Amino acid sequence: DPSGSPHIRILPQETFEDICRLPSDSGDCLRFFEMWYFDGTTCTKFVYGGYGGNDNRFPTEKACMKRCAKA
């Protein structure tokens, strides 16, 4: 974008919820980042390699629960 404005992508509600149904995916690299994913019931810690993977990946348990836990 020549204007230099950031791009904002709006996800449909079903896509938003589907992210939380994806399996944990450590990605394609061999680095070691402790991250959190939603396992269908709760948020669980896993090791992320730093590249690739899917969007069911959060920096904190709180961020994971906020996004995926049902009230």
UniProtKB/Swiss-Prot annotation:
Q: Which GO terms describe its cellular component?
A: extracellular region
InterPro entries from the entry? Kunitz_BPTI, Kunitz_BPTI_sf, Serpin_venom_toxin
Tell whether Secreted is among the UniProt keywords.
Answer: yes
Which BP terms does GO give this entry?
envenomation resulting in negative regulation of voltage-gated potassium channel activity in another organism
- Determine the domain of life of the protein's source: Eukaryota
Major location category of this protein:
secreted
Its localization reads: Secreted
User: What role does it play?
Assistant: Serine protease inhibitor that inhibits trypsin at a molar ratio of 1:1.
Question: Which PANTHER family does its entry note?
Answer: EPPIN (PTHR46751), WAP FOUR-DISULFIDE CORE DOMAIN PROTEIN 6A (PTHR46751:SF1)
What protein am I looking at? Kunitz-type serine protease inhibitor HNTX-852
Q: What organism is the protein native to?
A: Cyriopagopus hainanus (Chinese bird spider)
